[in-house]
């Protein structure tokens, strides 16, 4: 079941077609780690996360951010089945990594901020509303194993 209207889907897919996964992914994960420093504990293997510049310049942060957004691209192709799309990732993050599901919501909100910065006037309030709905749905799907 989907809560996404045809307009939501169009707004999401239209903007997504213009997103550079490497740039936006690195920026999103980097900002998450800077703004919410407690999230750094999940990335001990990434090397130096000692300052904002170290985080934003860290190649492992950029690579993992791109991986996260690549996964999000799969969700965008399957907006009507976010829970199914993220079933295995939910299990991994819950059972093995023990990630607080609140972090998924935070990451989604940071992504919306990054998209607004990168896409300026094109990121209208209507586009933002559709993206907020999508990142909330993704956060819920990723947290579904916890429920």
Curated annotation (Swiss-Prot):
<feature type="binding site" description="distal binding residue">
    <location>
        <position position="64"/>
    </location>
    <ligand>
        <name>heme b</name>
    </ligand>
</feature>
<dbReference type="InterPro" id="IPR012292">
    <property type="entry name" value="Globin/Proto"/>
</dbReference>
<dbReference type="GO" id="GO:0046872">
    <property type="term" value="F:metal ion binding"/>
</dbReference>
<dbReference type="GO" id="GO:0031721">
    <property type="term" value="F:hemoglobin alpha binding"/>
</dbReference>
<keyword id="KW-0813">Transport</keyword>
<protein>
    <recommendedName>
        <fullName>Hemoglobin subunit gamma</fullName>
    </recommendedName>
</protein>
<dbReference type="GO" id="GO:0072562">
    <property type="term" value="C:blood microparticle"/>
</dbReference>
<dbReference type="GO" id="GO:0005344">
    <property type="term" value="F:oxygen carrier activity"/>
</dbReference>
<dbReference type="GO" id="GO:0043177">
    <property type="term" value="F:organic acid binding"/>
</dbReference>
<dbReference type="InterPro" id="IPR009050">
    <property type="entry name" value="Globin-like_sf"/>
</dbReference>
<dbReference type="GO" id="GO:0004601">
    <property type="term" value="F:peroxidase activity"/>
</dbReference>
<feature type="binding site" description="proximal binding residue">
    <location>
        <position position="93"/>
    </location>
    <ligand>
        <name>heme b</name>
    </ligand>
</feature>
<dbReference type="GO" id="GO:0042744">
    <property type="term" value="P:hydrogen peroxide catabolic process"/>
</dbReference>
<dbReference type="InterPro" id="IPR050056">
    <property type="entry name" value="Hemoglobin_oxygen_transport"/>
</dbReference>
<dbReference type="GO" id="GO:0005833">
    <property type="term" value="C:hemoglobin complex"/>
</dbReference>
<keyword id="KW-0349">Heme</keyword>
<dbReference type="InterPro" id="IPR002337">
    <property type="entry name" value="Hemoglobin_b"/>
</dbReference>
<comment type="similarity">
    <text>Belongs to the globin family.</text>
</comment>
<keyword id="KW-0479">Metal-binding</keyword>
<keyword id="KW-0408">Iron</keyword>
<dbReference type="GO" id="GO:0031838">
    <property type="term" value="C:haptoglobin-hemoglobin complex"/>
</dbReference>
<comment type="function">
    <text>Gamma chains make up the fetal hemoglobin F, in combination with alpha chains.</text>
</comment>
<dbReference type="GO" id="GO:0020037">
    <property type="term" value="F:heme binding"/>
</dbReference>
<dbReference type="Pfam" id="PF00042">
    <property type="entry name" value="Globin"/>
</dbReference>
<dbReference type="GO" id="GO:0031720">
    <property type="term" value="F:haptoglobin binding"/>
</dbReference>
<dbReference type="GO" id="GO:0019825">
    <property type="term" value="F:oxygen binding"/>
</dbReference>
<keyword id="KW-0561">Oxygen transport</keyword>
<comment type="subunit">
    <text>Heterotetramer of two alpha chains and two gamma chains in fetal hemoglobin (Hb F).</text>
</comment>
<feature type="domain" description="Globin">
    <location>
        <begin position="3"/>
        <end position="147"/>
    </location>
</feature>
<dbReference type="InterPro" id="IPR000971">
    <property type="entry name" value="Globin"/>
</dbReference>
